[in-house]
Amino acid sequence: MDLYWDKTFLREQQRVLDKQIEWALEYGLPVVLHCREAFDHIYNVLKPYQQTPLKGIFHSFTGTSEEACRIMEFADFMIGINGVVTFKKSTLPEVLKNIPLERIVLETDSPYLTPVPNRGKRNESAYVKDTLVKVAGIYGNSPEKVAQVTSCLLYTSDAADE
């Protein structure tokens, strides 16, 4: 749901999101949520599904600590962190201090939001290592440990314990 440029089709976006959630539950698939200037709207759509097996990722999360904590209310939702965390004025390093490492995934928003030191270039998957290094520093872990936790949990629920 994207309300950054235009709120004209909010009702339609909400109906489509409801349908996608219905399909996700029916087929046991995750939802990937694009949330831009629309957190409260998405949260209100998700709230009735809180006690269901719905799972997903808040892709390209750039929200507040409060919003991140509200996402944590949904046991099977992850927060997608990309190059924004490396930006000088990013608030994500502070936000992440309240979020368990096990609840984030590293991602790109390619071709956008290229992490420092490549900011200004077209983003690509190879640059996720820069996001990884930044996140490792925030959590006080090695990049290898962060890679293991954030990658394995995407595919299996108990991989971080290995």
Regions from the language model: what does each represent?
Residues 1-74, 86, 94-95, 99, ...:
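Divalent metal-binding pocket/active-site signature
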Residues 77-81:
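Short, basic, glycine/proline-bearing loop/turn elements
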Residues 20, 132, 156:
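Aromatic/hydrophobic pocket-lining residues that form π-stacking "cages" and hydrophobic walls in ligand
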Residues 155-161:
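Conserved small/polar residues in nucleotide/adenosyl-binding loops
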Residues 102-110:
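Non-cysteine beta-strand/loop elements that form the S-adenosyl-L-methionine
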Residues 90:
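Conserved catalytic/ligand-binding micro-motifs in nucleotide and anionic cofactor chemistry
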Residues 137:
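Aromatic (Trp/Tyr) and acidic
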